[in-house]
C-alpha cells in the first residue's frame, strides 16, 4: 500500500528505424502520397517517420514516379521556397543527414543548402543494407528504398533488425494483418503512416530497443 502511493508511470521512447513496406496489391497513389507526407513532416524529424522503404520489385518505377508527384503537390517545384517545409534543427543534424546522400543513387531530390540547413526531400535507390543510412536512424528527409521479391523476404528483413518504434504497411488488408502478427513494433498503421499517434485512445510507446512503457490509451 505504501509503495502504491509512490508508483510513477515511466515511458522511455528511443525511436529507431521504422520500416514502410509497399507490397503487391497496394494502392500506389495512396502509398506514395501518405509516405511523402509522413517522411517530410517536420522534414523527417519525428520519432515515427518512415525511415526506410521496402517495396515489391515490380512496383519500384511506378512508386518513384508517383512519389515525385506527391512531393511536388506537397511542397511545390522547389521545396526550399515552400512555407510548409522546415529546416534541419542545427548544423550538426544537417551535416549528419546530408552525409547519407552519397550512400545510394539519388532517384528524387538530393539538393542541399548548408547556409539554410536545407535538404531537399530525397529518395535513394541502390542502397546497401550494411551502409550507415540503413543502420542509423535518419531523422531527416532522406528515404532509402530497397526492393523485395516476396512478402516473406520483406518481413524477414524487418525481423532481422531491432524492433522499430513504428511499422507501416501498404497492401491488401488481409496480408497486412498477417504481417502485423509476424512482426513486433511499438505501433503500426495499415495503409497509412504516423496517424496512430494522433488517436489519444490508442497506447503509444516502444518495444525492445525502441523503448518501453505506454502513454495515452
What are the residue ranges of the model-derived segments?
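ALDH superfamily catalytic-core signature
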Residues: 1-128, 151, 190
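Conserved C-terminal structural/oligomerization subdomain of aldehyde/semialdehyde dehydrogenase
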Residues: 21, 72, 118-217
Amino acid at each position: 500500500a505504501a509503495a502504491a502511493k509512490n508508483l510513477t508511470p515511466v515511458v522511455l521512447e528511443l525511436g529507431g528505424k521504422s520500416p514502410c513496406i509497399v507490397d503487391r496489391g497496394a494502392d500506389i497513389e495512396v502509398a506514395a502520397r501518405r509516405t511523402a507526407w509522413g517522411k517530410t513532416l517536420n522534414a523527417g524529424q519525428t520519432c515515427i517517420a518512415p525511415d526506410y522503404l521496402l517495396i515489391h520489385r515490380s512496383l519500384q518505377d511506378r512508386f518513384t514516379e508517383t512519389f515525385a508527384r506527391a512531393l511536388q503537390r506537397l511542397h511545390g517545384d522547389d521545396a526550399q521556397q515552400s512555407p510548409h517545409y522546415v529546416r534541419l534543427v542545427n548544423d550538426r543534424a544537417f551535416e549528419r543527414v546530408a552525409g547519407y546522400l552519397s550512400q545510394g543513387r539519388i532517384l528524387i531530390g538530393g539538393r542541399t543548402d548548408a547556409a539554410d540547413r536545407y535538404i531537399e526531400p530525397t529518395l535513394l535507390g541502390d542502397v546497401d543494407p550494411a551502409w550507415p543510412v540503413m543502420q542509423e536512424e535518419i531523422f531527416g528527409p532522406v528515404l532509402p528504398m530497397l526492393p523485395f521479391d516476396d512478402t516473406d523476404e520483406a518481413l524477414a528483413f524487418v525481423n532481422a533488425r531491432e524492433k522499430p518504434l513504428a511499422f507501416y504497411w501498404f497492401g491488401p488488408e488481409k496480408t497486412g494483418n498477417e504481417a502485423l502478427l509476424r512482426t513486433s513494433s511499438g505501433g503500426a498503421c495499415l495503409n497509412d503512416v504516423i496517424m496512430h499517434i494522433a488517436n489519444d485512445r490508442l497506447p503509444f510507446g516502444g518495444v525492445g530497443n525502441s523503448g518501453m512503457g505506454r502513454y495515452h490509451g
